[in-house]
Amino acid sequence: MNLNDRVEGIGNERSIVAKSTERKNKIPPSLKLSPVESVGEKSPTPATVYDLFKKYHKSDSVKPTEEDNMNVGFDKLSTDEKNGFLRKLQMLTVGSKKSSKVDESTPSPANRLLKKIVPSRRTSTEHPNSSNRMHIFGSSRTTKKSIDSERNSQRKKSARRLNFERDAEQKKDSTKTNNSSFVAEMTREYEKIVISKGAPVPINKANRNLYRNPRGSLETPTDSPQKGFSSSTESSPSDSMNQFPSREHFTSANEESPMKRKNFQQEHGNKNRDSDATWFGELPPRDYTSPTFSRKIFVGGVPWDITEAALKDSFGEFGSCAVEWPGQEARYRSGQSNLAPSNGSLRAQTKYTGQAATGYVYMIFEDERAVASLLHECSQEIGGAGEWYFKIRAQRSKSTEIRQVQIIPWVTSDSMFCEDDTLLETGIEPKRTVFVGALHGMMTAQVLHSIMEDCFGAVECVQLDTDKFKYPIGSGRVTFREHGAYFKAIEMGYLHVYTSKFRKRVQIDPFLESTCCMVCNSQSAHCFCRNKNCFKYYCHNCWALDHGKDDDQEVHIPVIVPSSASKAFPGATTRRSQVSSSLSLKNGSNNSQVNNSIPHFPSAGFPIIVGAPAQTLSALYGYIQNGQQLLKPAVFEPPMTPSPSEINKNRRSFTEFSTPPTVFFNSTPVISPQKSVSDGSPLPAYYNSAAFLTPPPTYYGSPNHPTSSNISQPQQPYYGANLYYGFIPPQQHPSAMMRSPNYGQ
């Protein structure tokens, strides 16, 4: 071999060594990775494993050797850096395994590095010469299923990125199943503990399966509640009430929990009322042939800054109309109180400057035919329960806004519903009558009749109180057919009505009348005890004797009888009574001799109705017929059964008169329970009005009747009931107290 051949051989050997060295130090090819969504992370920004290693390279790290081709100083990294490095390296190697076609048996620098950091966990059954070096990042193609099941499931799930979504869903389903079974088991244990202690189980979610047969139909159901009355506080007033969930299901964040209210009542000894009843259902669609509408309508959803001129402009095309603002509308319109609140709020000031800050107003037309014309221009939902929709124009600074408002008219025939028309002649028993308050404007007498009958028992008659425009004021009276249903309603105290249109908490109270004490039978009754152990009328002395015992654990709250409120709590003359007295002096002198025996304007807490017809107004709580004339104020208080001392022969009947009687009302501003005090005083806003029924002027001039000056005995009084029992005005009119027929007994 010559020298040239040796030189060529050495050169070839050097080239082979160089190639082998290059092959050893060759950088892995670039990986084309698609973004992998995993645990809220995307694939790392480095495109190759080399870039990733270079990112974590330390400046003072040891240079690579032949044994370890790529030493990046992994031991010098922090724990967080190690975890991040391994997580990103997993993503790259999984992608490289799928995209690169390198033989798996060929070890790579990354594989050798990971093998040193995270050693593989081989089982004794696995073949030692297995070619799967990346089994911790993916499932092996040569490993058996039994071996896969024995591996660590947590590490396998976290490393198997290609099947991550499926594993996550399976894990979520299994967790939900475990949680639901755990919660169900804990609930059963909790119920056992609560039942053993005898305490109610609060449930925060309404279970509609509890009332499979809801009393939503306004027709009388076949399984009507039992008519019997139970005096036990543990039993429910009605068997049907057990089907409904408690009020806790519908308690909002701003509403007081019924459990707190119940505990408060128990701490203060008020055990007179049971838990509230609940009624679920829908209002039936209304269908009238030739209805007679009230001249007053409710307009809801109006802009809070709308003006009276804009309302009249929108509704004036149907006829002359006036706007009645919520609250004391007479005071705001007349300008008697134009003082705005001190806080200067624009929304609060609009109420005092004649604007609707509450979002609703009342429109009053001169003719009821204008209401019918308005409804022809309104739209109505199919199967609506009495609500209509009308578009009004609201003027803005730079444009005109078209707003759709809600219209709720009222048909005058919906104010009363009786199953038997003979009740108009025979009259209604007040001892089976309850007062209901806080009624919604869409609840007619027939709807209230069906609701009360579904919940408590058979109902004879329902009448809603109306104002001088025959529009409901939110209260009424319900007469039951049996005493058992009456006691159930009184013991319940409140009734929750839930419909798709509204939710209301209706108040139920006994309807009181003027009578004698049921203990001594000599003094006039001063108060009424609604506790089921008493449930009778008391005078001052009998109440002190019967309820002054210290050993009685229950607190019996007295409900003041309206006719005795003035006598029990006399006070100085108020501005209201002074105005009433001054107004009474303005009456004509023709009736002065008759009117001197009866106070024309008693205080609001002592309503008197004089000379009421025995078979018309007195029979149905003072129901006003269409032919009778109503003067202000808006509220008409019904007459009640006369006092026991009154004899039937002393009553005066007006049914024989040809002309309808004239009705005179107290001109003092009187408030319904939905309104506030008119004179600005801090008194509560629950007053009664006083009404007087006197014969027409032609009565005394007829040949069969003497003149008014020849009447020796005054007319007999009839008493109306207080709207909210228990409220006692702190100051009463002294003339009403002295001129009371029961005063001085």
Curated annotation (Swiss-Prot):
Q: Which residues form the RRM domain?
A: 297-319
Low complexity: compositionally biased ranges: 230-240
Q: Give GO BP annotations, semicolon-separated.
A: negative regulation of cytoplasmic translation
- Report TM segments: none
Which domain of life does this protein belong to? Eukaryota
Q: Which UniProt keywords apply?
A: RNA-binding
Q: Where is this region: Disordered?
A: 1-45, 94-180, 204-283
- The name this protein goes by in its record: Cytoplasmic polyadenylation element-binding protein 3
Composition-biased stretches (Polar residues): 219-229, 241-255
Q: What does this protein do?
A: Cytoplasmic polyadenylation element binding protein that binds to and regulates the translation of specific mRNAs. May not be required for oogenesis.
Gene Ontology CC annotation, any one? synapse
- The biased composition feature labelled Basic and acidic residues covers 162-175, 264-276
What is an example of a GO molecular function annotated in this UniProt entry?
A: mRNA regulatory element binding translation repressor activity
Q: Which SUPFAM superfamilies match?
A: RNA-binding domain, RBD
Query: What organism, scientifically named, is this protein from?
Result: Caenorhabditis elegans
